[in-house]
Amino acid sequence: MTLNQIVKKVTDYGSQHPQINFVLYGDIYDHLSQGEVNYPAMFFNIEDVSISAKQIQYTFGLYFMDRQIENTEELEVMSDQILTAQDIVAQIRNNANEWIVGDSIPMVLFVESEPDVLAGVKASISLVLPSINNRCQIPT
């Protein structure tokens, strides 16, 4: 499975979720500053890739966020976004035939004030896939 195929699957999971209105793979801050986001939103990007003898591991940062009325509903928005993150993680974990997901997925709560007042959660998730590492597969 390629990185493109993984991104497509994760994008589909987000797009099919009834409480996510906008999904994007790429630089979160570029899109936030352009004002093209329909909240609640899910952004994700690749943070790290590592190759071992028989595996390749992709680590993604998944950001779940929504607008909040300034400083009044921060806890409510964070709570909702944690639940949405759990749903997407469950979908990703359900795809065990293609990758392995670790038991623990660290999540960090955040608040942003520019360009919108946002609250949400970032989940760091690693997907481990088999990799043959066979030089005979190199195109000639």
Segments predicted by a language model, with ranges:
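Low-complexity, acidic Ser/Thr/Pro/Gly-rich terminal tails and inter-domain linkers that flank the onset
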Residues: Q34-N45
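Charged, amphipathic alpha-helical segments and their flanking helix caps
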Residues: M1-G26, F43-T140
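Short acidic low-complexity segments
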Residues: Y25-G35
